[in-house]
């Protein structure tokens, strides 16, 4: 039996979906894939649905767990490391790819201890603590943004996006910025965003009716009711969904987006060519979402609106300016598309096989 590539990714869509894109590329070449994650993250649902074997570790994040959490941390990590070693012994992977999430740390150390080729991929424009540490153990260090971890030989390959995203026609071919009325997509990430759920409806209510766009909004399962009440109170019609499964179709539909600035979101905006008002998550570690947004905004593809400055009045002003100028939206869409790295998933898959035992 052909030895698999072990992919470690979990938690939110920002880790899981780029890793799934790489898994697709590997399996297209006949390379089996095994996944290492947890039972609590998004991977527990989407990885088995993709017909990929999922191995789970009992591990959780250390931040925000208080003194008891930190005291227990060595025991939790040692248990997870022992479990990860068992996974590697069972599957004997030819290479191990770490793409973030709680299982990636113990899994990467296990790969290093068993001398399996370790490749890590840092999606964000600011490297996280785990990847800064693991970069010392990795054979190859790959990055989604340029200039990250240069001291460890970081290679800028872009952030992998799913094949369906890369197949979306370019902005001109799909009539981006030319629909009447214009189409607004609001995406708060896979967990939603309370600030967007409450502010966007109020901002839209401030626009003249003739200028209001058609709206689709991913509000998150836990915050769906709050968003529905906000839209009802504002008197704004909306296609409101807890989670959008087919993001390729959603991005294809959109003329403009309002969203967070997670690495996956920015990569998909670029791959498809969608202009956006980016509202970085203020509590993100090392403020990495603001860093993720900078290249996109500097290229003329979007507007940066810090949450500290987010209000219905300010957002309405930004929307009014953009929606009144479809040619500008079309130019912004082309700028976004020019930043895309549609070959990122194939590149990461190729590097895994180059380093394979």
UniProtKB/Swiss-Prot annotation:
Annotated membrane topology: Peripheral membrane protein
UniProt keyword annotation of Membrane present: yes
Record EC number: 2.4.1.227
Presence of keyword Cell cycle: yes
Subcellular location, principal: membrane
Binding, UDP-N-acetyl-alpha-D-glucosamine: 12-14, 124, 162, 190, 244, 263-268, 289
Gene Ontology terms: biological process: carbohydrate metabolic process; cell division; cell wall organization; lipid glycosylation; peptidoglycan biosynthetic process; regulation of cell shape
Compartment(s): Cell inner membrane
A GO CC annotation given for this chain: plasma membrane
Chemical reaction(s) catalysed: di-trans,octa-cis-undecaprenyl diphospho-N-acetyl-alpha-D-muramoyl-L-alanyl-D-glutamyl-meso-2,6-diaminopimeloyl-D-alanyl-D-alanine + UDP-N-acetyl-alpha-D-glucosamine = di-trans,octa-cis-undecaprenyl diphospho-[N-acetyl-alpha-D-glucosaminyl-(1->4)]-N-acetyl-alpha-D-muramoyl-L-alanyl-D-glutamyl-meso-2,6-diaminopimeloyl-D-alanyl-D-alanine + UDP + H(+)
Top-level lineage group: Bacteria
Cited Pfam families: Glyco_tran_28_C, Glyco_transf_28
Functional description taken from the UniProt entry: Cell wall formation. Catalyzes the transfer of a GlcNAc subunit on undecaprenyl-pyrophosphoryl-MurNAc-pentapeptide (lipid intermediate I) to form undecaprenyl-pyrophosphoryl-MurNAc-(pentapeptide)GlcNAc (lipid intermediate II).
Protein name as it appears in the record: UDP-N-acetylglucosamine--N-acetylmuramyl-(pentapeptide) pyrophosphoryl-undecaprenol N-acetylglucosamine transferase
Organism expressing this protein natively: Alkalilimnicola ehrlichii (strain ATCC BAA-1101 / DSM 17681 / MLHE-1)
Native organism taxonomy: Bacteria, Pseudomonadati, Pseudomonadota, Gammaproteobacteria, Chromatiales
Gene designation per UniProt: murG
